[in-house]
Amino acid sequence: MYVSISFLLGLSHLVLCCLLTFIVNFYLPPESIDFEFMAHNWSKGRSPSSTLGLSWFKAGFRFSDGWSMFYSFGLPGVALPGSPPRSHLLPGTQILIRSFQPCESAKHSARLSSLLTTTSYSVS
């Protein structure tokens, strides 16, 4: 019984991750991301903490110029990339932004090189 419940919870988590990745990749264009909004409306915070009790998801997409952005965010906050209204975000929700830039020689193979920056924002 315990194994089947664990399996169903794991499966539902996988389905939610896939759905979220689909939304980010195919529904939200890169141009909809408003970093100005994020920088001014969300206070800078620490990396996601397990003490918050949030389920963290990761999603990412590639820009046409070779840049890639990857996001991690808490499920309760409904913090999708873009410029979501603050009223839709619960206090304590954090977004972790990781920026990568591909090497010149790796652009055609879509391989990423070094990690450039890691920034974390939390809703106050």
Swiss-Prot record:
<keyword id="KW-0472">Membrane</keyword>
<feature type="transmembrane region" description="Helical">
    <location>
        <begin position="3"/>
        <end position="23"/>
    </location>
</feature>
<feature type="topological domain" description="Cytoplasmic">
    <location>
        <begin position="1"/>
        <end position="2"/>
    </location>
</feature>
<feature type="glycosylation site" description="N-linked (GlcNAc...) asparagine">
    <location>
        <position position="41"/>
    </location>
</feature>
<keyword id="KW-0812">Transmembrane</keyword>
<feature type="topological domain" description="Extracellular">
    <location>
        <begin position="24"/>
        <end position="124"/>
    </location>
</feature>
<dbReference type="GO" id="GO:0016020">
    <property type="term" value="C:membrane"/>
</dbReference>
<protein>
    <recommendedName>
        <fullName>Putative transmembrane protein FLJ36131</fullName>
    </recommendedName>
</protein>
<keyword id="KW-1133">Transmembrane helix</keyword>
<keyword id="KW-0325">Glycoprotein</keyword>
<keyword id="KW-0735">Signal-anchor</keyword>
